[in-house]
Design a protein with these regions (language model features):
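Active-site-proximal loop/turn and secondary-structure-junction residues that shape catalytic pockets
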Residues: 119, 148-150, 166-168, 186-190, ...
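Glycine-rich phosphate/ribose-binding loops and adjacent secondary-structure elements
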Residues: 225-396
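Flexible hinge/switch segments at interdomain interfaces of large molecular machines
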Residues: 105-109, 207-214, 278
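Hydrophobic, small-residue-rich alpha-helical packing segments that form membrane-like cores
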Residues: 170, 192-220, 224, 229-235, ...
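Conserved radical SAM core fold
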Residues: 122, 189-192, 214-221, 225, ...
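Hydrophobic faces of well-ordered beta-strands that scaffold small-molecule active sites
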Residues: 113-116, 140-144, 158-164, 180-184, ...
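Mobile "lid/hinge" segments at catalytic clefts and subdomain interfaces of large enzymes
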Residues: 178, 183-185, 189-213, 377-400
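Conserved, well-structured core domains of diverse proteins
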Residues: 1-113, 117, 122-136, 140-141, ...
Length: 400
């Protein structure tokens, strides 16, 4: 029997056949020409995946993770004929700095830089006491940070600030009377308008006892102080702290950089002895990544506004301006001072000096933290491989 002729099926342009082959080849050939997705980058996609699994925002520590204007964008114009330079090897450059010159006992620093407030809890006992010893050797000061005082930090610190925070965790009026200065924490640069965070992994029995909290639970400080609703109340709080310390030591207000001119102007009218301004480059022991990346303003813009605000209310020479945030070395400090700051506070830089993010023999960053030394931002986890930001006794032993 003759064979039946079968009609060949025409290829559908959208399914199968040569169209698929061409599409596949086109995809391979044009991959490099089309480029990468500028909005949903691999990092963004990975971030969404992680948040979908967590069911909440991501927490992290350390400094800002996006590019903003920094002190690297500024350069100095050295003196030539217009201004003679100092002969550093035989002429003295005065570095003594006075915070709160109107006080009976102002804080006098040999250098215009001190260690900012980082709590016992966020940092280990070894880190806190090492910073206290180092600051004293340099003729500088330290600050308790939130959560109260550890006696050895006070003992090793020749000059020491005691921090008053929104939650009052660990606050003790008797300890405040031992301080050389009081710092009222209103905000910080990396999470302006938010309270403090300390993850439960770091809330050991000792930390919990100091803060009157159950151990092992996350500690979240409120965003607002319960003692005031506005500048008038804040002025009363400043006066209350003066009475507590018998009008002898400086009272300092710490602000995160936001509406800098207005905020600093209002703060200065409350008549503190110093105002501490924290730029968005400032680090944190724990905070929401989304807030850190999207709030605040850079220090190089903030300092000038703060200086102008203090001058405009007639407080020049009366209210000391302290800047912190993204300070890495002497050049950054000098630029901040040139912009109008009177003194500098450092945090992350001092932690790095203690081996933060250093590839020490005892630590294996990739195995323990999943990142290389130098890329670690896991301060909030309590598993710091170098013993700086942990309460684990085995890890603390790595910080000698």
């Amino acid at each position: 029997m003759p064979k039946k002729k079968t009609k060949k099926k025409k290829s559908n342009g959208s399914v199968g056949g040569k169209a698929d082959v061409h599409a596949h080849e086109e995809g391979k050939r044009n991959k490099s020409l089309l480029g990468h997705n500028a909005i949903f980058t691999p990092e963004v996609i990975d971030d969404i995946h992680i948040k979908a699994q967590l069911g909440r925002y991501r927490m992290r520590g350390m400094a800002l993770m996006k590019k903003i204007p920094t002190f690297d964008d500024l350069v100095f114009l050295p003196g030539t004929l217009t201004r003679f330079v100092i002969e550093g090897y035989r002429e003295k450059c005065e570095t003594k700095t006075v915070i709160g010159p109107r006080c009976e006992n102002p804080i006098e620093l040999d250098i215009p830089v001190y260690i900012t407030g980082m709590s016992f809890g966020a940092l280990s006992y070894e880190a806190k006491t090492a910073l206290a010893r180092g600051a004293t050797m340099a003729g500088s000061a330290t600050c308790s940070g939130e959560g109260g005082m550890i006696p050895d930090e006070r003992r090793y610190s020749e000059k020491w600030y005691y921090q008053c925070i929104q939650s009052r965790y660990g606050f003790n009026p008797h300890h405040a009377q031992l301080a050389d200065g009081i710092e009222v924490f209103i905000g910080q640069g990396q999470k302006v308008g938010m309270g403090g965070h300390l993850m439960g992994q770091k809330v050991t029995d000792q930390v919990a006892e100091m803060r009157s909290l159950p151990s092992g639970i996350d500690q979240r400080s409120p965003a607002r102080h319960p003692d005031w609703l506005g500048p008038d109340d804040l002025a009363l709080k400043v006066e209350e702290l003066r009475q507590l310390t018998k009008n002898k030591v400086p009272i300092q207000l710490k602000l995160g950089a936001s509406k800098v001119y207005d905020d600093v102007r209002m703060a200065a009218k409350c008549d503190p002895d110093s105002i501490y301004l924290d730029g968005m480059e400032g680090s944190t022991g724990a905070g929401p990544h989304i807030a850190a990346a999207n709030t605040g303003i850079p220090g190089i813009a903030a300092i000038r506004e703060a200086r102008r605000a203090i001058d405009d209310v007639g407080k020049t020479g009366k209210v000391t301006l302290i800047y912190a945030g993204g300070i890495r070395d002497g050049a950054d400090m000098a630029k901040a001072l040139a912009l109008g700051a009177d003194a500098i506070a450092i945090g992350t830089g001092s932690m790095i000096a203690l081996n933060c993010n250093k590839d020490i023999p005892e630590a294996n960053f990739e195995k323990e933290m999943g990142v290389k030394a130098g890329d670690c931002y896991h301060c909030h986890t309590g598993r710091c491989p170098v013993g700086v930001a942990t309460q684990d006794p085995k890890l603390r032993a790595r910080l000698n």
